[in-house]
Amino acid sequence: MSVDTSSTLSTVTDANLHSRFHSRLVPFTHHFSLSQPKRISSIRCQSINTDKKKSSRNLLGNASNLLTDLLSGGSIGSMPIAEGAVSDLLGRPLFFSLYDWFLEHGAVYKLAFGPKAFVVVSDPIVARHILRENAFSYDKGVLADILEPIMGKGLIPADLDTWKQRRRVIAPAFHNSYLEAMVKIFTTCSERTILKFNKLLEGEGYDGPDSIELDLEAEFSSLALDIIGLGVFNYDFGSVTKESPVIKAVYGTLFEAEHRSTFYIPYWKIPLARWIVPRQRKFQDDLKVINTCLDGLIRNAKESRQETDVEKLQQRDYLNLKDASLLRFLVDMRGADVDDRQLRDDLMTMLIAGHETTAAVLTWAVFLLAQNPSKMKKAQAEVDLVLGTGRPTFESLKELQYIRLIVVEALRLYPQPPLLIRRSLKSDVLPGGHKGEKDGYAIPAGTDVFISVYNLHRSPYFWDRPDDFEPERFLVQNKNEEIEGWAGLDPSRSPGALYPNEVISDFAFLPFGGGPRKCVGDQFALMESTVALTMLLQNFDVELKGTPESVELVTGATIHTKNGMWCRLKKRSNLR
């Protein structure tokens, strides 16, 4: 559940149908053909030849950068300026271009989008400065502007004062007893999906009696929605097996959130847009359906509140509660004082941030495993040894080390989100980072900053063989003696942590952000992904239907596919 989610910005419109959203129209996204990670670097650079003279670049792109430089008062200190042409952004995800410019200009550079400039950061030293050391000098900037109409004062778009108050209330809800109860929900929902697959295997009309072909991205999307519904609201969407007006409204809202995060001009802020533009009218209708549902759930939770003693509430047995949801905890702990509107904003944030992240993580984990059969067999061997045919439990997750490493390695190669967005609230001096200016870079208040998680996770300066799928890499200490200001990777730096994090990597690995505004639901999302992947591999062998190159990548709030992740599933031979 990535509560600190953010997204790419785009100037390109591209209407596509995506089965993951149940045949809804998905515009304003980039798509790009993808292959195995080790081949990505050669593909992503094909539209940029850094040996070309700058004068040979697209004239419009150069003019755009010149205008940006003039309007922003020249370069920010001696910060390099990316002179990418507009054509560099066509037909490929933005973060691929950001990577190319990172290799060309360094870990901190200024990027022009018309008359607007952004600072792009691809260095853990600088990311640590922004996210942890100087966290309260930055807010979510343009991301908050985009998402406020949808999430209100939820954790993502909230101003700092509101965020501090809501964080104090919500963070205690993600305690170990709650997570242990959630693992039961994860397994129950995953079992529904496994049962659905088994029933399809028993049917007819597929390519053989022992296999079925499915869009696993769509299936993971439905699974993640059901888990969020039960774990956060105590509401069963049942989207694995059915549709309803609420489910359609949820997907419509998710779609609109993604649309707004990938469209550069916020036309929806025009007062008449909600009445004139058909998609905005539909969004208002979808939002009304969801808000009515959430208001009813909040009302029921308040009316059914029985225990008022805070100490007893904190000590109750979550495993045996009929309703162990986050909503139940927040209402019980705050009682009549809880504000319905703020609570609804919090729940909406959890719904949108939590759903997309998990579905994307599972999709890319399967994509990577399908290209590495030996690693899939190793994962299945671990599952067989630890669980046999049993269900995952909170305790058994601690023994499923390789599955956990697969999940985090998938997040390293395909971070969700690929960008974190911040805006400086006051002037600041960014560190120069690796190979940057020793005195750093002064930036004025109001500067929009892109922290490229994708660049951080694939940086050749901080990772060995950064494009390779190597789950075991997080077990190996990487003592850094060459890069001043970066402590290297050390698994012992975060004792007791089930999953690698920004602490062990000193901010070179940021799957859920870092610092005070780090995602509050990171363990929820990681455990959810681990359980779902475990149960899939426990029951099935998975192959890609086509070639890796046939999988087209689309970016919005997260990294997903253009036409689904079509795979061939076979019942494992030991279970037939």
Swiss-Prot record:
What InterPro entries would the database entry show?
A: Cyt_P450, Cyt_P450_CS, Cyt_P450_E_grp-I, Cyt_P450_sf, Cytochrome_P450_Monoox
Q: Which Pfam families match?
A: p450
Gene Ontology cellular-component terms for this entry are: chloroplast membrane
Compartment(s): Plastid, Chloroplast membrane
Q: Where is the transit peptide?
A: 1-44
Instruction: Name the Enzyme Commission number(s) assigned to this protein.
Output: 1.14.-.-
| Main subcellular localisation | plastid
Among its keywords, does the record have Chloroplast? yes
Q: Which cofactor does it need?
A: heme
The UniProt record lists the keyword Protein biosynthesis: no
Please tell me where heme binds in this chain: 519
A molecular function annotated in GO for this UniProt entry is: monooxygenase activity
List keywords of the entry alphabetically.
Answer: Chloroplast, Heme, Iron, Membrane, Metal-binding, Monooxygenase, Oxidoreductase, Plastid, Transit peptide
- Per the similarity annotation, which family is this? Belongs to the cytochrome P450 family.
Identification of the protein by name = Cytochrome P450 97B2, chloroplastic
Q: What is the lineage of its organism?
A: Eukaryota, Viridiplantae, Streptophyta, Embryophyta, Tracheophyta
